[in-house]
Regions:
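Generic macromolecular interface patches on structured domains
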Residues: 55, 59-62, 147, 172, ...
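Extracytoplasmic
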Residues: 101-172
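Short leucine-rich amphipathic alpha-helices used at interfaces
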Residues: 13, 132-133, 145, 151, ...
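Cytosolic-side ends of inner-membrane transmembrane helices, especially those
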Residues: 26-36, 171-172, 176, 180-192
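Extracytoplasmic ligand-binding sensor domains of the Cache superfamily
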Residues: 54-55, 61-131
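A generic short-segment signal for beta-strand/edge and adjacent turn/coil regions
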Residues: 13-15, 20-23, 49-56, 104-108, ...
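Juxtamembrane segments flanking the first transmembrane helix
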Residues: 2-90, 164-167
Length: 192
């Protein structure tokens, strides 16, 4: 087949268009799946944050205290990758609360992590714990009833657990789209 023939140009352009579209679809679908997983994970963290808010009250000294417990047992397992903490403003020494799982180690988000907030004032970001686990965290500031100070409520979950599912989806997606690509190329070659 000559490179300047009509059939060669038709095969070549069809193959290039098919490959570009399949690669674009692969990246777009992988991104959309990752975004959906993050939104779902953030919604779970938000539900835990709401439960935490319902259980924290100010003491007579102005320090926060826990009235009940968080129902999820992962927050009691040491260094599980599931943490919550309630911190006072940086200029106040009111004491802070944290989950048993943190073992006195606190998560310290950067100012950049806390800068971007959604409409509800929630910052969502990734952070590493002391064990090197990648965590998905949300943070929101609240004024507790009866107090003037704005406390930082942070809840974080082990995102490494979900990364394996995301990777499995990507492998399956890339495999299926590669097979589809080979099928399209074969059909283009057979038709021309």
């Amino acid at each position: 087949m000559r490179t300047n023939s009509l059939s060669f140009r038709l095969i070549f352009t069809s193959a290039v268009v098919a490959i570009v579209l399949l690669v674009s679809a692969a990246f777009l679908l992988a991104y959309l799946f990752q975004s959906a997983v993050e939104r779902n994970f953030d919604a779970r963290l938000r539900a835990i944050l709401d439960g935490l808010l319902a259980n924290v009250e100010l003491g007579t000294d102005g320090a926060p205290g826990m009235e009940g417990q968080i129902a999820d047992p992962r927050f009691s397992i040491p260094l599980s990758g599931w943490y919550w903490q309630v911190s006072p403003p940086k200029d106040k020494a009111l004491g802070e609360l944290a989950s048993e799982s943190s073992l006195e180690k606190r998560l310290v988000p950067t100012d950049a992590d806390l800068k971007a907030r959604d409409v509800g004032g929630v910052a969502s970001f990734y952070i590493l714990d002391s064990e090197g686990k990648e965590l998905r965290a949300i943070e929101q500031k609240f004024n507790l009833f009866g107090g003037e100070d704005e406390f930082s409520f942070l809840v974080a979950g082990n995102f490494d657990e979900l990364k394996e599912e995301v990777q499995a989806f990507r492998r399956a997606l890339y495999g299926v789209l590669a097979l589809l690509g080979f099928g399209l190329l074969a059909s283009i070659l057979l038709q021309v």
